[in-house]
């Protein structure tokens, strides 16, 4: 005997149909979802956020971004010295970050200075560092 598929109702909330297929309990809490309707992250937005955190997931890039978040701008040699990285490895990471719009480069003669120009990213990096310090402590 074939198992009969139970069809869940489609709820109407503020003119939007919500398919409850797969819900174990067909129960909605309008008071809980009313404040967030239309405010949740879009699919495109979630891709952007995931890409941002993907860039930050690399420890070398996180250290570079944190250093640039706590200063105005630094030349490649200074960043390499502070972080204990080779200029070659650092240049590779800086190019990666610049191509994705995380840092900007200013050339003065043969010197290249990098800076973090996005205040949202600066706050995110600084908050992440503060959180890491609390977790480690």
Kindly give the residue locations of the regions a language model identified.
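N-terminal helix-turn-helix DNA-binding core of bacterial DNA-binding proteins
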Residues: 39-86, 112-119
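N-terminal leader segment of winged-helix/HTH proteins
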Residues: 1-56
């Amino acid at each position: 005997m074939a198992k009969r598929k139970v069809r869940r109702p489609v709820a109407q909330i503020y003119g939007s149909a919500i398919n409850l297929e797969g819900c174990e309990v067909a129960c909605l809490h309008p008071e809980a979802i009313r404040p967030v309707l239309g405010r949740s992250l879009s699919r495109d937005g979630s891709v952007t956020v995931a890409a941002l955190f993907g860039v930050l997931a690399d420890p070398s890039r996180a250290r570079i971004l944190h250093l640039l978040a706590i200063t105005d701008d630094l030349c490649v040699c200074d960043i390499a010295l502070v972080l204990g990285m080779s200029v070659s490895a650092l240049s590779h990471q800086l190019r990666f970050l610049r191509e994705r719009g995380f840092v900007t480069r200013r050339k003065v003669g043969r010197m290249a200075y990098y800076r973090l120009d996005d205040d949202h990213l600066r706050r995110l990096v600084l908050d992440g560092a503060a959180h890491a310090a609390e977790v480690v402590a």
